[in-house]
């Protein structure tokens, strides 16, 4: 009613109706906002196991806090390999067996066991096209990524999701991610920022 009163001096009812329609559409966009939190590869082998490092261990508490307090839907990814890993291209370039399905190293870290029943995506590559396509079909408007490693699987999934969902707001929480090294972590964040992925410092 206030908005109509403010425009009472405008003689064209068409202009009034167009403005009210625009306001209604804007409010509708707010109402249908749909958020998703994607937890990338928070598995034992990347934290305390074969490929773990101090940087990854240091962000565990931040990740757990984020997961426990988000109002978004939650999904997670699992880096997943078989016993033939040494014969794959990745295995030849990174000859460290890790995240072999069914082993303790493949499992989510104990601190995140409470989300293991949520939707998840097993992937034998850095990025998951299955995840990106699923996000498109679900109609999410905002997607935030956290996890490890920033410079490998986080950036790969952020870019893949962006490619499949160009109009979705993609963000990465830097404080809930860690890389192979601090420098590679920073480099990956800068690269994503350059591709219009929002970085939360």
Predicted stretch roles:
Residues 12-15, 24:
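Low-acidity, Ser/Thr- and Arg-rich intrinsically disordered low-complexity segments
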Residues 8-10:
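Targeting/processing segments of secretory and organellar proteins
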Residues 144-148, 168-182:
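A short glycine-rich beta-strand->turn/loop micro-motif centered on a GG-aromatic cluster
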Residues 3:
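Cationic, low-complexity basic patches in intrinsically disordered or flexible, solvent-exposed regions
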Residues 25-120, 171, 180, 186-194, ...:
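Active-site acidic carboxylates
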Residues 66, 155-163:
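Histidine-anchored nucleotide/phosphate-binding helix
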Residues 102-152:
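Internal catalytic-core helix/loop-beta-alpha segment
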């Amino acid at each position: 009613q206030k908005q109509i009163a403010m425009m009472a001096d405008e003689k064209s009812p068409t202009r009034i109706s167009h403005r009210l329609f625009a306001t209604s559409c804007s409010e509708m966009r707010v109402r249908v906002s749909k958020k998703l939190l994607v937890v990338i590869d928070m598995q034992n082998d990347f934290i305390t196991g074969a490929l773990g490092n101090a940087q990854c261990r240091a962000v565990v508490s931040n990740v757990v806090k984020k997961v426990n307090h988000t109002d978004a839907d939650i999904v997670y990814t699992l880096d997943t390999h078989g016993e033939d890993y040494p014969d794959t291209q990745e295995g030849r370039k990174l000859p460290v067996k890790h995240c072999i399905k069914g082993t303790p190293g493949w499992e989510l870290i104990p601190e995140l066991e409470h989300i293991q029943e949520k939707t998840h995506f097993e992937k034998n590559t850095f990025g998951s096209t299955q995840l990106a396509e699923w996000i498109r079909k679900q109609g999410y408007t905002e997607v935030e990524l956290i996890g490890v490693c920033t410079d490998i699987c986080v950036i790969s999934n952020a870019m893949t999701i962006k490619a499949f969902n160009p109009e979705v707001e993609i963000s990465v929480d830097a404080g809930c991610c860690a890389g192979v090294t601090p420098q590679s972590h920073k480099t990956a964040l800068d690269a994503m920022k350059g591709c219009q992925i929002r970085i939360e410092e």
